[in-house]
From Swiss-Prot:
WD repeats lie at residues 36-75, 78-117, 120-159, 162-202, 204-245, 246-285, 287-326. InterPro entries: U3_snoRNA-assocProt_15_C, WD40/YVTN_repeat-like_dom_sf, WD40_repeat_CS, WD40_repeat_dom_sf, WD40_rpt. The modification N-acetylalanine is found at residue 2. Part of the small subunit (SSU) processome, composed of more than 70 proteins and the RNA chaperone small nucleolar RNA (snoRNA) U3. May be a component of the proposed t-UTP subcomplex of the ribosomal small subunit (SSU) processome containing at least UTP4, WDR43, HEATR1, UTP15, WDR75. Interacts directly with UTP4 and WDR43. It is found in: Nucleus, Nucleolus. Pfam families: UTP15_C, WD40. It comes from Pongo abelii (Sumatran orangutan). One of its GO terms (biological process) is positive regulation of transcription by RNA polymerase I. One of its GO terms (cellular component) is small-subunit processome. There is a cross-link at residue 249 (Glycyl lysine isopeptide (Lys-Gly) (interchain with G-Cter in SUMO2)). This is U3 small nucleolar RNA-associated protein 15 homolog.
Length: 518
């Protein structure tokens, strides 16, 4: 007697997102560590120098965290009101921050009391940065002004009053100590030169500007405001290169990867988008639990830190390369185990019998082997199977139909069991890969349970859903056939015109309108 042959489960190609190098790179982070702050995290900034600590601005405090620590190693709390935009100097030794009362404070990273206090703004200071020479600080405030401060003398050097609304973001050039950028709620981004008394360039963004970023080379400017991220060429007078609209809500922060090849943007829609700086297409996306206010990347992209409106600081560390642990050496079998039976000499009358390989059957195969057809169908109609592996359910239905026992397996079911069958049909009947098998199953179910329709509201509702699905599919197929008919007519007309033009233009190899002299 031949052995039982398991049901062949038809496999289908898995359609999903293409796995790229960016996907592998940006997914190579550990589970995020979440730190609760006292208020919304308005700014995160990494020190440019080892050990790459980062400053977190939240409420009226500035916390300094170690690269891998979950506890703050230093706190600056000498603020009367909310603190903003704590930023490291290029050497990582000083940190500057603005505040709600209009003051700008300079701190030594090794101390606690402010080294300098710059007073001059009349409203909240939301952006501060060090210039490239390390001896000046630029600040922008809600009083519409931009000021340049001298650190050694604690004095104001210049004041620019060209913005007509709140100045909420800015950055200084990393190459030129006299150039810096500011963005305002008046929809403009301006470039100022400390050697002049007015701006040297103004770019219209079209929305209140929330964040600006200058590429290390100084040639490209990125501005974020509203749902737009715009990239401008500063060497061509601020010419717009590309406008990106990949977020659903206001973009609040921008960041560059360590290599400068990827641009990151965070938004109130709780997403961080990663763009290629060559094609400006989204190559990856991160999802977070709350709206995002700030974003920063560590050296070599080893850590990504995101600050949110609910006061949560999300910290992701890159996975380290797995090291092979030196496990104790397994004891090998004895030598006699390998030579057992090797010295046996074959005889002419010996009969060689191969030990049959034991086949492990699935539970539904065991039921089919013992002709428990209803039980086999029940197993594959379990919600876990129908949702994760619907192809198994379809294969079993196809096998039962081949055996001619599908009607017997579907008959005699109660309200709950028939609901499972109808749910599966409703979910998968419109899929082209399953339709040939499931249409036949649907016809059998209708024939069996037609006499009892109207006795169960639950089953009646499922049948109505199935009817609506079939009608919608029929309308869809009719529209497709109409479209195919129109396309065939167009193609036929084009072929007829091409054939006619060839006949008109050629007659025995010569143009028709040309007379041939005899």
């Amino acid at each position: 007697m031949a052995g039982y042959k398991p049901v062949a489960i038809q496999t289908y190609p898995i359609l999903g997102e293409k796995i790229t190098q960016d996907t592998l790179y940006w997914n190579n982070y550990k589970t995020p560590v979440q730190i609760k702050e006292f208020g919304a995290v308005s700014k995160v900034d990494f020190s440019p120098q080892p050990p790459y600590n980062y400053a977190v601005t939240a409420s009226s405090r500035i916390h300094i965290y170690g690269r891998y620590s979950q506890e703050s190693i230093k706190t600056f709390s000498r603020f009367k009101d909310t603190a903003y935009c704590a930023t490291f100097r290029q050497d990582g030794r000083l940190i500057v921050a603005g505040s709600e009362d209009g003051g700008v404070q300079l701190f030594d990273i090794s101390g606690r009391a402010p080294l300098r206090q710059f007073e001059g703004h009349t409203k909240a200071v939301h952006t501060v940065d060090f210039t490239a020479d390390k001896y000046h600080v630029v600040s922008g405030a809600d009083d519409y002004t931009v000021k340049l401060w001298d650190i050694p003398n604690s004095k104001e050097v210049l004041t620019f009053k060209e913005h007509s609304d709140y100045v909420r973001c800015g950055c200084a050039s990393k190459l030129n100590p006299d150039l810096f950028i500011t963005g305002s709620y008046d929809h403009t981004v301006k470039m100022f030169d400390a050697r002049t008394s007015e701006s040297v360039l103004s770019v219209e963004h079209g929305q209140p500007v929330e964040s600006v970023l200058l590429f290390p080379s100084g040639g490209l400017l990125v501005s974020a405001g509203g749902r737009y991220v715009k990239v401008c060429d500063m060497l061509k007078g601020g010419q717009l290169l590309v406008s990106l609209k990949n977020h659903h809500k206001t973009v609040t922060c921008l960041c560059l990867s360590s290599s400068g090849q990827r641009l990151l943007s965070g938004s109130l829609d709780r997403k961080v988008k990663v763009y290629s700086t060559t094609s400006y297409k989204v190559v990856h996306s991160f999802d977070y639990a709350a709206s995002i206010l700030s974003l920063a990347l560590a050296h070599e992209d080893e850590t990504i830190v995101v600050g949110m409106t609910n006061g949560i600081l999300s910290v992701k560390h890159r996975k380290s390369e797995a090291k092979k642990e030196s496990l104790p050496r397994r004891r090998r079998p004895a030598y006699r185990t390998f030579i057992k039976g090797k010295n046996y000499m074959k005889q002419r009358d010996d009969i060689l019998i191969n030990r049959p390989a034991k086949k492990h059957l699935e539970l539904y195969d065991r039921d089919l082997k013992h002709f428990r057809i209803s039980k086999a169908l029940d197993r594959v109609l379990d919600p876990t199977c129908t949702i994760k592996t619907p192809e198994i359910t379809v294969s079993i239905i196809k096998e039962l139909n081949r055996r001619g026992v599908l009607a017997n397996a579907l008959a005699g079911r109660d309200e709950k069991e028939i609901s499972h069958v109808l749910n599966f049909l409703i979910r998968n009947l419109s899929q082209p890969r399953f339709a040939p098998v499931l249409i036949n199953a649907a016809e059998i179910i209708i024939d069996i349970y037609l006499p009892v329709i109207g006795q169960s509201p639950v089953v009646d509702k499922k049948f109505l859903l199935l009817q609506g699905l079939v009608e919608k599919e029929i309308d869809y197929q009719r529209e497709l056939l109409e479209t195919l008919g129109m396309m065939d007519m167009l193609f036929a007309t084009m072929r007829r015109k091409e054939g006619t033009s060839v006949l008109e233009n050629t007659s025995d190899g010569f143009p028709e309108n040309k007379k041939i002299e005899s």
